[in-house]
Amino acid sequence: MTEKINLLNLSETELQGFIASQGQPLYRATQLLQWIHQRGVTDFSLMTDLSKPFRQQLSEASFVRVPELALERVSADGTHKWLFRLADNNKIETVFIPDRKRGTLCVSSQVGCALNCSFCATGKEGFNRNLTLAEIIGQVWLAARLLKSPYKITNVVMMGMGEPLLNYEAVVAAMHLMMHDHAYGLSKYRVTLSTSGVIPAMRRLREESPVSLAVSLHAPNDALRNVLIPLNKKYSLDQLIPLCRDYYSRGSKRCVTFEYVMIEGMNDRLIDAKQLIRLLADVPCKINLIPFNSFQGTAYRCSTESAISVFQKCLMDAGFNTRVRRTRGDDIAGACGQLAGQFHDRTGRHQRWVQKQGHDFNRPIPAIDH
């Protein structure tokens, strides 16, 4: 007997192939996209503009399954953080950040993270596996159903757990669905992928997906970036910066956004700002300064407000569009760099971290009753 297929795990092209294999016209794929993503229907029997024989055919050959809600927390500032349970019982985190007329969903791409950035809680938890397409787009599907009016998803950022470009195929397919007119209909300007700088995948992304690009920079030189982002030892700044400079075509109004976490005494001095100015001198870009969000066991501390202000002014005086990202959801460990999830670490990285610190830093998350 042929194994049933989770339709959420199919790209648009694969869904069309599945429809053709069922002897149906291709417009059925569009109908399914609308039922599943726009209307949130996963029960084929309720898809009333499909014929009864086709609905029966679908139920025999396929299903629609999303991750399930394990826990939810809501911050004092309105930020929502969800812990989603996957079929293998690993759990990932997804965050929704409301802001006036805008609602940004921060989506995870891996169970844990394959990288080990020193300032990020996810990296200290280790790594289990890549998420499937169904598990990535399923976060968007679930969030859209869990949010109550007036909250609405207007933007998606691939900035949750994991390095998106180390899960390229599933992430790009999911972002395509986010922008698809018959799914979530988001503009390419409202879907952003953040990467630590996986150079080959960045080159491929530039050719294959129109989404906005953000780069986790966090340091103005290789020596410091090697400490903060070990991936830099493989893909150094002399490879990363030229690619960012030429990522969008000349004359385009679009530019790369650089993310720069502000860590006291490490990368927040005036000399660091001046070095950053020289590094990015000919790169069309925006710069987001991110106050460091602490997590248990880290020795890092956030820069002072005055240090951040001086740093920002130095960059702005040099002509850089620079903003300080307002910290959201830190009271529920939902801010940038704080996502951890709950999963089995296949790398042993988390256990080494625990042994080094002397105790376990897994944080229990209280549930909200539904």
Curated annotation (Swiss-Prot):
Domain annotation Radical SAM core: ranges: 99-331
Sites where the protein binds S-adenosyl-L-methionine: 162-163, 194, 216-218, 293
GO biological process: rRNA base methylation; tRNA methylation
Keyword Cytoplasm: yes
Subcellular location(s) per record: Cytoplasm
Enzyme's top EC category: transferase
Organism: Coxiella burnetii (strain CbuK_Q154)
Pfam families for this protein: Radical_SAM, RlmN_N
One of the record's GO molecular function terms: tRNA (adenine(37)-C2)-methyltransferase activity
Positions annotated to bind [4Fe-4S] cluster: 113, 117, 120
One cellular-component annotation, GO: cytoplasm
Active-site residues, record numbering mapped to chain: 93 (proton acceptor), 336 (s-methylcysteine intermediate)
Chain's role: Specifically methylates position 2 of adenine 2503 in 23S rRNA and position 2 of adenine 37 in tRNAs. m2A2503 modification seems to play a crucial role in the proofreading step occurring at the peptidyl transferase center and thus would serve to optimize ribosomal fidelity.
Record bears the keyword Lyase: no
Name used for this protein in its record: Dual-specificity RNA methyltransferase RlmN
Catalyzed chemical reaction(s): adenosine(2503) in 23S rRNA + 2 reduced [2Fe-2S]-[ferredoxin] + 2 S-adenosyl-L-methionine = 2-methyladenosine(2503) in 23S rRNA + 5'-deoxyadenosine + L-methionine + 2 oxidized [2Fe-2S]-[ferredoxin] + S-adenosyl-L-homocysteine; adenosine(37) in tRNA + 2 reduced [2Fe-2S]-[ferredoxin] + 2 S-adenosyl-L-methionine = 2-methyladenosine(37) in tRNA + 5'-deoxyadenosine + L-methionine + 2 oxidized [2Fe-2S]-[ferredoxin] + S-adenosyl-L-homocysteine
